Amino acid sequence: CSYSASRKNLYISKNTKVICQGFTGKQGTFHSQQALDYGTNLVGGISPGKGGKTHLGLPVFNSVKEAKEQTGASATVIYVPPPFAAAAINEAIDAEMPLVVCITEGIPQQDMVRVKHRLVRQDKTRLVGPNCPGVINPGECKIGIMPGHIHKKGRIGIVSRSGTLTYEAVHQTSQVGLGQSLCIGIGGDPFNGTNFIDCLDVFLKDPHTEGIILIGEIGGNAEEDAAAFLKENNSGPNAKPVVSFIAGLTAPPGRRMGHAGAIIAGGKGGAKEKIAALQNAGVVVSMSPAQLGSTIYKEFEKRKLL
């Protein structure tokens, strides 16, 4: 069984039934209400010890297994504090939940190494995050903490390690009239459940996605891997336009820049190398996060896709 078989679970829609772990907590309550207001098909939540009650007019369950059996949910979003978040992810894997979106920042790295070890040895569950804004199919389903109102149904697939820079790309693609087909925040931690390649594979196969924005940052080699994947799978006359921005061009080596994974270590993970790798794969790299929308618009113009 191959973990990559679960990539298809990233494609959420208005038919996706969602539950929330950490449902009755402060974050869970706030963001669940936002999701309901957006129109997400949220069908219940989990709060151990509070099973049988209702919250926000929805049923509360003691376990993910119980919630999945009772509601038929195919996705769960996790707003559980860092010390208990890995256990929450594991519980969702046990229940074979097709999509798990973990928002929590600050999960101990050792916990995530163990989760990841388990994750890649199964094919039922796809994890997005941790330390990410989530996944949204505009106008249909919002799983996570992204502001719904800036999104607009459209043609661009967006994948990013940064939350706020995702919102920048979203707002700009909405403003130039291209909109978004699917936006995935893969998170800023070094050990996460979904990488650039997973998302690029979904975008390249999706007929609704006509262009791609990839937002990376210093640290690790995910961008270099993504560049190699694009070179292999997105070249020739039918290639989809890809625009990218890499944060941290001026970052000093050895200093962690906001995200746990955003660090230049052992002389590797700098922005220059990442930019060069992407350009070599035919990606148009924008030097400013403020020009992502205009850059992809120009690429669409060039290819007469407008």
From Swiss-Prot:
Taxonomy, superkingdom: Eukaryota
GO cellular component: mitochondrion; succinate-CoA ligase complex (ADP-forming)
Gene Ontology molecular function: nucleotide binding; succinate-CoA ligase (ADP-forming) activity; succinate-CoA ligase (GDP-forming) activity
Family: Belongs to the succinate/malate CoA ligase alpha subunit family.
Enzyme class: ligase
Protein name per Swiss-Prot or TrEMBL: Succinate--CoA ligase [ADP/GDP-forming] subunit alpha, mitochondrial
Chief place where the protein resides: mitochondrion
Stated role: Succinyl-CoA synthetase functions in the citric acid cycle (TCA), coupling the hydrolysis of succinyl-CoA to the synthesis of either ATP or GTP and thus represents the only step of substrate-level phosphorylation in the TCA. The alpha subunit of the enzyme binds the substrates coenzyme A and phosphate, while succinate binding and specificity for either ATP or GTP is provided by different beta subunits.
Active-site residues per Swiss-Prot or TrEMBL entry: 259 (tele-phosphohistidine intermediate)
PANTHER family named among the record's database cross-references: SUCCINATE--COA LIGASE [ADP_GDP-FORMING] SUBUNIT ALPHA, MITOCHONDRIAL, SUCCINYL-COA LIGASE SUBUNIT ALPHA
GO biological process, one term: tricarboxylic acid cycle
Residues noted as binding CoA in the record, renumbered to the chain: 24-27, 50, 103-105
Pfam families to which the protein is assigned, alphabetical: CoA_binding, Ligase_CoA
Known pathway: Carbohydrate metabolism; tricarboxylic acid cycle; succinate from succinyl-CoA (ligase route): step 1/1
Compartments (UniProt record): Mitochondrion
Organism: Columba livia (Rock dove)
Keywords: Ligase, Mitochondrion, Nucleotide-binding, Tricarboxylic acid cycle
Catalytic activity: succinate + ATP + CoA = succinyl-CoA + ADP + phosphate; GTP + succinate + CoA = succinyl-CoA + GDP + phosphate
InterPro entries referenced in this protein's UniProt entry, alphabetically: Cit_synth/succinyl-CoA_lig_AS, Citrt_syn/SCS-alpha_CS, CoA-bd, CoA_lig_alpha, NAD(P)-bd_dom_sf, SUCC_ACL_C, Succinyl-CoA_synth-like
EC annotation from Swiss-Prot or TrEMBL: 6.2.1.4, 6.2.1.5
Residues reported in the UniProt entry to bind substrate: 167
PROSITE patterns the record matches: SUCCINYL_COA_LIG_1 (PS01216), SUCCINYL_COA_LIG_2 (PS00399)
Subunit structure: Heterodimer of an alpha and a beta subunit. Different beta subunits determine nucleotide specificity. Together with the ATP-specific beta subunit SUCLA2, forms an ADP-forming succinyl-CoA synthetase (A-SCS). Together with the GTP-specific beta subunit SUCLG2 forms a GDP-forming succinyl-CoA synthetase (G-SCS).
